[in-house]
UniProtKB/Swiss-Prot annotation:
Belongs to the universal ribosomal protein uL16 family. It comes from Endomicrobium trichonymphae. InterPro entries: Ribosomal_uL16 (IPR047873), Ribosomal_uL16_bact-type (IPR000114), Ribosomal_uL16_CS (IPR020798), Ribosomal_uL16_dom (IPR016180), Ribosomal_uL16_sf (IPR036920). One of its GO terms (biological process) is translation. Gene3D superfamilies: Ribosomal protein L10e/L16 (3.90.1170.10). This is Large ribosomal subunit protein uL16.
Amino acid sequence: MLMPKRVKYRKMHRGRMKGKAKGGVSLAFGKYGLQALEPVWINSNQIEAARIALARSIKKGGKVWIRIFPDKPVTKKPAETRMGKGKGDPQFWVAVVKPGRVMFEMEGIPETEAKKALRLASNKLPIHTKILVRADI
């Protein structure tokens, strides 16, 4: 499960996901990529499920890059607890993904297999996505 080794502060504000992604919007490593079309919090379990789906689909043929990392803690108060008395304890970690962000990249396999693998990975994520293909000039 992905999470930071150390953080300066245990708890964070929720924040807002306004606008489009500023960075990480184009393919940087691989030939094929999976791009987000909606703003969403993706937790570490969902990233891991998509990674496993990609790895099983491509077997030992290609290489996969994960371009997002869950570095935001999400807190939760215990069940049947009254309001107040401070913020709850961190429960899981999320990556804040805005529209346009490339989440996964891959290379080393044919285009049809890559698109099939990325489609399987996108089914594991709670978000609409688009498959990108690098145009070599």
